Amino acid sequence: MEAPPPAPRSRLCGAWGPFPRVFAAGAVAADSQSFVEDPELRSYVSDPGSSESGWDRLRQLFVKDEQRKISKEMDYICRAALSAGIIGWAYGGIPAFIYAKRRYIEQSQAEIYHNRFDAVQSAHRAATRGFIRYGWRWSWRTAVFVTIFNTVNTGLTVYRNKDALSHFAIAGAVTGGLFRINLGLRGLVAGGIIGALLGTPMGSLLMALEKHCGETVQERRQKDREAQQEQRLEEWRRNLQVTELLPMEIESGLEKIQPEKDAQRIEELLRLPRNPASPDKQSED
């Protein structure tokens, strides 16, 4: 019995041709080069160095960063609103406490109490009710006033990316007009004028204090924004470098595989005897 003839070279080449490891290195290198040169592929990695418009800066005020923290401008507005609420509560509550206690003592001269402690406790209850009632009225009004004023002023400053005295005047006009809008059109106009007149000297005072300190709030915000932008740009460069080196790592890993062993296994499989023909094919013959 003759030995089976060796597998033809053409069959080996045909089996080895579509094998995925043959042209993988070249394909990976081509993909790496095309990624570096193709700007469309590089666009999938977001570039933080692009210029920002006024609306982009304004939108970032209400968006949390990567650490789920609000912007410093919004933090300043919230802190100012809380401080204004506390100051307003003290401004309206303390005089109301004293007035309510005095008024209760004047109106309760004819009342009969069991002891002195009961009379003092009743007077303190009346004073506490006055403190809570009038303190809350002044508190929420002051907090809303300061919040609207700071929001408009900060929004204009961030949008235009500079400090200006007109921002304080516009913020005062908007705040005063909204607080007097319940009086109709005349109240809206009068409140806007009064707010602008009060906002202008307040803005002048704040800007003078900032210049005296040597650094304005906008300059500090600009420095913080530039530092964040530089940090994002550095992170973007690292991510881009990792993305460009990934195909090279894949290529080096594929080159470490020994193709001789794979070729030997394919030759052994091709030398195995063929499967016997099926009964259907024999009947056809």
From Swiss-Prot:
Membrane topology recorded in Swiss-Prot or TrEMBL: Multi-pass membrane protein
Annotated compartments: Mitochondrion membrane
Record-annotated membrane-spanning stretches: 80-100, 137-159, 165-185, 188-208
GO biological process assignments: mitochondrial respiratory chain complex I assembly
Keywords: Chaperone, Membrane, Mitochondrion, Transmembrane, Transmembrane helix
Taxonomy, superkingdom: Eukaryota
GO terms for cellular component: mitochondrial membrane; mitochondrion
Record InterPro entries: TIMMDC1 (IPR055299)
Family from the record: Belongs to the Tim17/Tim22/Tim23 family.
Function per UniProt: Chaperone protein involved in the assembly of the mitochondrial NADH:ubiquinone oxidoreductase complex (complex I). Participates in constructing the membrane arm of complex I.
Subunit structure: Associates with the intermediate 315 kDa subcomplex of incompletely assembled complex I. Interacts with TMEM70.
UniProt-recorded name of the protein: Complex I assembly factor TIMMDC1, mitochondrial
Organism of origin: Rattus norvegicus
Gene name, Swiss-Prot/TrEMBL: Timmdc1
